């Protein structure tokens, strides 16, 4: 079974020949991996990664416009001010050059399932607003935020459609809502402000037959039902170290969702505790013998992780998923 086929089997709730594997390793460890393995690409080939996380696309706002607004507001941009400037054109062709080249390599040459980083609604606007101000604006400027979010949602939809046109397999919406023990804001706020604007992109992607995933760090248990309603098929990372429960997922959500995650960068990998690392990898792989899970890091592996530990982890994962697939 090819990597892309394997991932699709899992997302469609069928049992694959083995659990797909992936890892977010490039961002903090590119130099170290290149020294140890030759390149990140060689590392990905060595462990036969089944997916590729692709980045790129046109900018959403001109930095000059944001800087001017910030200067005018004394270092602060409020929602009404942001509405004074336009988003950039999501159809600008050169913005997709990197997506095309990465897709050619990973999908066409390596046979991997490719997913593209796509803006959500809350996280992407923490850039212009600042996260502390943004959280305050949820209470102060709901009317204005509806319009800011509507514009963002329409931009996101166009970007997602363009990526599907290029041959991207899955639209991966990144939108951090979770804190260590729950949401950063009340679930009712999520339902009023976040949900309807995610729905714009989600509906369009599902109508096209594209696959759909969402990333949120932290604990998003309170809105899992809403994530299902939106049509998301994959959730990353389902963070156990923030209090989320994979047993609860298996009992209540496994018929609707697939988890991509398992290797926790906050508590497990990068701390030199190989016995704990081994136990956790064995536990996670053992929980999902019949599908429903894509093994991945919960976020970017941090730069305090040694190459010896990284190799230990992925040697073990590589071996375990193949042993499991033979049963």
Q: Can you describe what each PLM-predicted range is?
A:
Residues 1-327:
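Catalytic cores of TIM-barrel enzymes
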């Amino acid at each position: 079974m090819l990597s892309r086929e394997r991932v699709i089997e899992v997302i469609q709730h069928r049992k694959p020949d083995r659990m797909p594997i992936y890892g977010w390793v490039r961002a903090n460890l590119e130099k170290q991996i290149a020294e140890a393995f030759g390149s990140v690409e060689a590392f990905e080939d060595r462990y036969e990664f089944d997916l590729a996380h692709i980045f790129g696309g046109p900018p959403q706002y001109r930095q000059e416009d944001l800087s001017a607004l910030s200067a005018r507001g004394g270092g602060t941009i409020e929602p009404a001010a942001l509405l004074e400037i336009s988003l950039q054109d999501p159809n600008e062709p050169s913005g997709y050059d990197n997506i095309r080249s990465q897709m050619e390599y990973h999908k066409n040459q390596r046979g991997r399932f490719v997913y593209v980083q796509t803006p959500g609604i809350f996280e992407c606007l923490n850039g212009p607003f600042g996260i502390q101000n943004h959280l305050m604006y949820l209470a102060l400027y709901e009317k204005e935020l509806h319009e800011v979010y509507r514009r963002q949602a329409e931009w996101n939809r166009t970007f997602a459609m363009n990526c599907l046109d290029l041959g991207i397999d899955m639209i991966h919406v990144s939108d951090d809502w979770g804190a260590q023990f729950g949401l950063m804001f009340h679930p009712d706020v999520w339902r009023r402000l976040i949900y309807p604007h995610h729905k714009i992109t989600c509906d369009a992607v599902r109508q096209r037959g594209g696959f759909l995933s969402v990333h949120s760090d932290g604990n998003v248990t309170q809105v899992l039902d809403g994530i299902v309603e939106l049509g998301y098929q994959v959730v990353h990372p389902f963070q156990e170290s923030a209090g989320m429960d994979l047993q609860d997922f298996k009992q209540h959500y496994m018929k609707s969702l697939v988890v991509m995650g398992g290797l926790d960068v906050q508590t497990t990998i990068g701390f030199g505790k190989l016995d704990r690392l081994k136990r956790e990898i064995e536990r996670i792989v053992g929980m999902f013998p019949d599908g429903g899970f894509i093994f991945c890091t919960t976020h970017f592996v941090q730069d305090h992780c040694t190459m010896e530990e990284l190799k230990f982890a992925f040697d073990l994962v590589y071996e375990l998923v193949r042993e499991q697939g033979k049963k």
